[in-house]
Amino acid sequence: MSQEFSRARRVGELLQRELARLFQEELKDPRVKLVTVSHVRVSPDLRQAKAYVTFLGKEEDTQEQLAVLNKAAGFLQHGLSQRVELRVIPRLQFVYDDSIERGRRLSALIDKAVQKETDGESDNSTE
């Protein structure tokens, strides 16, 4: 059983690398700019893959860019079939990866809490 999961992980890493190359070399849609593939999760049967992506640019454009990628999934699957030797290329689904934004918010909250604590200590030391 664990062998299936390690194979799925290896296939996911391979798809991540090849999708990144496809975005650089093949995808010419002007609505999609600077796509980063964070990671790819492949189902244990290797039939479906979720590609987690981020975009550089305005946050408002994220949903439109995701829609464009999901519409181009067939084109990208065909491109993968030309580059990767797998019996079946997984069906692609693109999902926005908000982990970077979430990390940024958490970091800001931590910085704010540390600043409050530092301000509180400096107020107590002056008394």
Swiss-Prot record:
UniProt-listed GO biological process terms: maturation of SSU-rRNA
Compartments it resides in: Cytoplasm
Role summary: One of several proteins that assist in the late maturation steps of the functional core of the 30S ribosomal subunit. Associates with free 30S ribosomal subunits (but not with 30S subunits that are part of 70S ribosomes or polysomes). Required for efficient processing of 16S rRNA. May interact with the 5'-terminal helix region of 16S rRNA.
Pfam families assigned: RBFA
Lineage top rank: taxon: Bacteria
Source species of the chain: Nitrosococcus oceani (strain ATCC 19707 / BCRC 17464 / JCM 30415 / NCIMB 11848 / C-107)
Keyword terms of this UniProt record: Cytoplasm, Ribosome biogenesis
InterPro entries reported for this sequence: KH_dom-like_a/b (IPR015946), RbfA (IPR000238), RbfA_dom_sf (IPR023799), Ribosome-bd_factorA_CS (IPR020053)
Protein family: Belongs to the RbfA family.
PROSITE patterns: RBFA
Listed GO CC annotations: cytosol
Annotated Gene3D superfamilies: 3.30.300.20
NCBIfam families xrefs: rbfA (TIGR00082)
Molecular-function GO terms, alphabetical: ribosomal small subunit binding
Protein name, per record: Ribosome-binding factor A
Self-association and partners: Monomer. Binds 30S ribosomal subunits, but not 50S ribosomal subunits or 70S ribosomes.
